[in-house]
Amino acid sequence: MGIHGLAKLIADVAPAAIKEHDIKSYFGRKVAVDASMCIYQFLIAVRQDGNMLQNEEGETTSHLMGMFYRTIRMLEHGIKPVYVFDGKPPQMKSGELAKRSERRAEAEKLLEAAEEAGEVENIEKFNKRLVKVTKQHNEECKKLLSLMGIPYVDAPCEAEATCAALVKAGKVYAAATEDMDALTFGTPVLLRHLTASEAKKLPIQEFHLNRVFQDIGINHEQFVDLCILLGSDYCETIRGIGPKRAIDLIRQHKTIEEIIDNIDLKKYPIPENWLHKEARQLFLEPEVIDADITELKWTEPDEEGLVAFMCGEKQFSEDRIRNGAKKLAKNRQGSTQGRLDDFFKVTGSISSTKRKEVESKGSTKKKSKTGGTPAGKFKRGK
């Protein structure tokens, strides 16, 4: 779920904190990708006749197809992804997980009714609501990534928190996820829509946390309290306090405790046994890997291993998998070229007009030297 309404709130009150870019803008960048979010997207989107792709044994393969081709697409644009997998959910998330189970049970009933009535659109809609990322999905994707030569990290707890830790440690440029709570966990840069289907033609949204703080006039601790008021996975919120009211209260009173002391509790009743302090602690000091000592290595793909797994076990087209493996090897050879800003630190600023002129000249030179790389098409397997 992330944080209720946070993206819209930032767009309304701190629009300069959001930039929109094409995928080509991230050439040479290392990015920590929320693996569970990606796999969920693939299970929803990679379908044939409304159903998830399967092999002859009836095993789902949508997640593998999505992971294979979307990862290749990133590599073709010079992006070096590292995937971060969820660990155990925090105890505080048990309430949210219980609600999800209830919604899934309700969707099962609605699906059954839709099937009896022959309502094709509703059948597809409720089928998607039943999608859940399983341990098997995760393990198969880890095996695939290893064969592709792509690093992955097992987070001890929430993947978004470990993504944020990798960004803060300077191991990667940004965290890529649709969950806005990556910002609450403190990632300096968040990318949304990086792994979205090419067909959707969505620009990549880049959020800068320090600019959010600057434009709203709050610090990280106050931002965490704001997110708790908006609504998170970890505790209830105060009913009746919407996004604009929440931001005004945080600006005025700084903390949830001070807000409680200064609002009409009859009009805005506090949830019983409210765990806002525990939620704050979870966001400010999450359980994460030691990012400073974590080494990320991108290696040569194992073409024969990929064929054995994806074709021998999962029955994908051998021609397509071998073609993908060759793209992996080619992009591995070309991945040593980095970005200029990896070697030089910016000590001053230039005007937006001059910056555009510099970028324009740079892109012209790059095109004349290397030629354009065609965007990787998202292909169907099998």
Swiss-Prot record:
DNA binds at residues 47, 70, 158, 231, 233. InterPro entries: 5-3_exonuclease_C_sf, Flap_endonuc, HhH2, PIN-like_dom_sf, XPG-I_dom, XPG/Rad2, XPG_CS, XPG_DNA_repair_N. GO terms for cellular component: mitochondrion; nucleolus; nucleoplasm; nucleus. Mg(2+) 2 binds at residues 179, 181, 233. Keywords: DNA damage, DNA repair, DNA replication, Endonuclease, Exonuclease, Hydrolase, Magnesium, Metal-binding, Mitochondrion, Nuclease, Nucleus, Phosphoprotein. Binds 2 magnesium ions per subunit. They probably participate in the reaction catalyzed by the enzyme. May bind an additional third magnesium ion after substrate binding. Residues 122-253 are annotated as: I-domain. It is found in: Nucleus, Nucleolus; Nucleus, Nucleoplasm; Mitochondrion. Residues 336-344 are annotated as: Interaction with PCNA. Phosphorylated. Phosphorylation upon DNA damage induces relocalization to the nuclear plasma. Residues 352-382 are annotated as: Disordered. It is an enzyme of class 3 (hydrolase). It comes from the Eukaryota. Mg(2+) 1 binds at residues 34, 86, 158, 160. Its cofactor is Mg(2+). Its EC number is 3.1.-.-. Residues 1-104 are annotated as: N-domain. GO terms for biological process: base-excision repair; DNA replication; DNA replication, removal of RNA primer. The keyword DNA repair applies. One of its GO terms (molecular function) is RNA-DNA hybrid ribonuclease activity. Interacts with PCNA. Three molecules of fen1 bind to one PCNA trimer with each molecule binding to one PCNA monomer. PCNA stimulates the nuclease activity without altering cleavage specificity. Structure-specific nuclease with 5'-flap endonuclease and 5'-3' exonuclease activities involved in DNA replication and repair. During DNA replication, cleaves the 5'-overhanging flap structure that is generated by displacement synthesis when DNA polymerase encounters the 5'-end of a downstream Okazaki fragment. It enters the flap from the 5'-end and then tracks to cleave the flap base, leaving a nick for ligation. Also involved in the long patch base excision repair (LP-BER) pathway, by cleaving within the apurinic/apyrimidinic (AP) site-terminated flap. Belongs to the XPG/RAD2 endonuclease family. FEN1 subfamily. This is Flap endonuclease 1-B. The gene is fen1-b.
